[in-house]
């Protein structure tokens, strides 16, 4: 049973896409899995090179920009968001609304959205080993995984209202710019 890990971003340094690839590389050694990378941006070619370097090219799919994110998220088992800066984490919220648990960094609004040990796991940004460990732990425990799926969906429902999301984004941008 192959696991699908996913990351969605603009491939800018702040999103730490190389960390996503390194996390996946560790997970892949333990669990049969694939990585889907959605989006495009300045670090894409570096990320493609890293996949070649790690010998995982055949397991990583670069999808470019996509319009139908829910369709892609519906096949995912885990959403990886190791950003070093994030105001809110809308793509993580979208994943959670599709019952996809999240492994994220602890920056910006992510800890408010992704509840550690309930909807996914949180680690310090840059801690590739810990994020990989959490991913393996969650994907290896079906009972816990199903609970996290339900929790992620329920948590996303709280934030679903467009107005709330807009308010949170403004709030976090204000806080982060101070």
Placement of each model-derived feature along the sequence:
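Aromatic "clamp/platform" in nucleotide-sugar-dependent glycosyltransferases that forms part
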Residues: 65, 84
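A short, well-ordered alpha-helix in the C-terminal region of glycosyltransferases
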Residues: 130, 137, 144-158, 170
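C-terminal alpha-helical cap of glycosyltransferases
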Residues: 161-178
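Conserved acidic donor-binding segment of nucleotide-sugar-dependent glycosyltransferases
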Residues: 116-117, 121-128, 137-142
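A short alpha->beta transition loop at the rim of the catalytic pocket in nucleotide-sugar-dependent
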Residues: 70, 77, 99
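Short glycine/serine-rich donor-binding loops of glycosyltransferases
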Residues: 89-92, 110
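A conserved nucleotide-sugar
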Residues: 2-6, 17-62, 144
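Short hydrophobic beta-strand element within catalytic cores of glycosyltransferases
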Residues: 101-104, 114
């Amino acid at each position: 049973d192959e696991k699908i890990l996913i990351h969605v971003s603009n491939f800018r340094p702040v999103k730490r896409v190389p960390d996503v690839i390194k996390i996946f590389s560790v997970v892949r050694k333990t669990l049969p899995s694939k990585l889907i990378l959605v989006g495009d941006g300045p670090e894409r070619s570096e990320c493609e090179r890293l996949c070649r370097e790690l010998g995982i090219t055949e397991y990583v799919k670069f999808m470019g920009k996509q319009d139908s994110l829910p369709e892609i998220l519906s096949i995912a088992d885990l959403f990886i968001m190791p950003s070093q800066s994030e105001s809110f984490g809308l793509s993580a919220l979208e994943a959670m609304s599709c019952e996809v648990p999240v492994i994220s960094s602890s920056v910006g609004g992510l800890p408010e959205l992704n509840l550690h040990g309930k909807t996914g796991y949180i680690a310090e940004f840059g801690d590739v080993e810990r994020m990989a460990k959490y991913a393996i732990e969650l994907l290896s425990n079906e009972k816990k995984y199903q609970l996290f799926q339900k929790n992620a969906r329920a948590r996303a429902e709280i934030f679903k209202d467009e107005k709330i999301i807009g308010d949170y984004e403004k709030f976090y941008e204000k806080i982060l710019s101070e």
